């Protein structure tokens, strides 16, 4: 570096040598921190390696957090080894540097519209407390307090901010919630197999996608009310494999949920035990002990498959030009009903058969039906056997 402008930066005893609690690091390639020569406005590069199950949490330079100056603190796969760089412009002869490692938060700190973005949580704690705000220090050491946002998921890899964390049992959001960036809750909790409780919630006031939000959350028994605003555009695979759901929320947080859903695709696929009420667009889907529930909605047709259901388990309300049309699978063990919205006024005249198949061994259970389930008038001429034990494999029930 320029010899005429060299200054000796004496890093204090806050960090003797090149080690820190639960990890080690180098500064500008030097493992011994006795003397470093850096110019004003020069850059410091820290290469770090955390101990097992620990991650980089913060870098404190002259008593200020420098995380806000970092675009990314670690590899996207949640690695605890990597490098970070930031500019310095302090002319003080004595500088202090502290590198912190934590078993909890590992940040991705790109800024977005004056907010701190949390892209990934890779901690090992069973209880996670999501911060409401975070202090960011500018290059001029000015402190700015910014809201924390949750970043959208990487749809290609199927990983959300908390995705694939098998240790998390409880997530505590701050009162008032945390907003999700770009209105995408995709895979937010996917594969959080130990997650059993979510307190408070994220919120949003714009178009929302819930693609795979609770996929394979096998320990979560109740989903809290979800955010939602002007439009719900996609709830595909939302609860795929979430096997113990006992209560669904109102999408949008109220009975008068917003309109505009463009896709419901396999929302309840492979859900082994479901009960309760699910509402979307002010329309109710009653689910009673459903298994492998599959629901699709598009502008062309509605396809409802309830595979392996022993009970009167699913009622799907389909949008038509004349209003909502109730499609019920009354006691069908495995059935498929396909209806074209263009033909919603002449469904009775459709010639395709409804196929009812047995896909697994029948285990006698209490077959008491839900009080909320009603036989539909729109397919009154389609008779689906209510006693699943009498339905033979491959039997077709003609209209």
Task: Kindly label every feature range from the protein language model.
Residues 42-44, 93-97:
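Exposed beta-strand face motif in extracellular beta-rich ectodomains
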Residues 37, 41-44, 52-54, 338-399:
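Mature, Sec-exported extracytoplasmic domains of Gram-positive
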Residues 3-11, 24, 37-38, 67-73, ...:
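Solvent-exposed loop and capping/linker segments of extracellular ligand-binding repeat ectodomains
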Residues 30, 51-53, 91, 121:
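Short glycine/proline-centered coil/turn motifs in the loop regions
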Residues 43-80, 165:
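Surface-exposed interfaces of beta-sheet-rich extracellular modules
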């Amino acid at each position: 570096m320029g010899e005429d402008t060299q200054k000796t930066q004496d890093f204090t005893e806050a960090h003797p040598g090149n080690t820190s609690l639960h990890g080690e690091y180098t500064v500008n390639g030097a493992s011994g921190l006795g003397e470093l020569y850096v110019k004003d406005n020069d850059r410091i590069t820290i290469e770090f390696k955390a101990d097992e199950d620990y991650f980089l949490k913060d870098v404190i330079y002259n008593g200020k957090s420098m995380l806000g100056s970092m675009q990314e603190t670690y590899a996207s796969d949640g690695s605890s080894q990597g490098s970070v760089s930031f500019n310095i412009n302090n002319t003080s002869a004595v500088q202090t540097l502290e590198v912190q490692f934590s078993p909890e938060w590992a940040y991705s700190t790109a800024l977005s519209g004056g907010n701190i973005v949390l892209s990934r949580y890779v901690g090992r704690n069973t209880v996670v407390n999501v911060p409401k705000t975070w202090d960011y220090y500018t290059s001029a050491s000015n402190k700015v307090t910014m809201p924390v946002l949750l970043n959208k998921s990487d749809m290609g890899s199927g990983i959300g901010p908390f995705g694939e964390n098998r240790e998390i049992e409880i997530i505590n959001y701050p009162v008032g919630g945390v907003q999700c960036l770009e209105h995408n809750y995709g895979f937010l909790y996917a594969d959080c197999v130990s997650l059993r409780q979510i307190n408070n919630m994220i919120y949003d006031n714009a178009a929302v996608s819930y693609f795979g939000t609770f996929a394979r959350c096998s320990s979560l028994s109740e989903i809290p009310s979800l955010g939602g605003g002007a439009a719900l555009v996609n709830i595909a695979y939302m609860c795929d494999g979430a096997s113990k759901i006992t209560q669904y929320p109102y999408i949008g947080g109220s009975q008068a949920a917003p309109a505009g859903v463009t896709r419901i695709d396999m929302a309840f696929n492979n859900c082994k035990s479901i009960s309760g009420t699910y509402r979307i667009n002010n329309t109710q889907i009653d689910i009673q002990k459903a298994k492998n529930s599959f629901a699709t909605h598009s502008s062309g047709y509605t396809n409802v498959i309830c595979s392996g259901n022993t009970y009167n388990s699913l009622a799907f309300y389909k949008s038509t030009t004349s209003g909502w049309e109730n499609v019920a699978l009354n006691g069908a063990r495995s059935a498929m009903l396909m209806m074209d919205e263009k033909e919603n006024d002449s469904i009775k005249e459709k010639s395709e058969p409804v196929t009812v198949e047995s896909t697994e061994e029948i285990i006698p259970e209490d077959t008491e039906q839900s009080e909320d389930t009603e036989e539909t008038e729109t397919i009154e001429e389609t008779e689906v056997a209510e006693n699943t034990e009498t339905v033979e494999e491959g039997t077709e029930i003609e209209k």
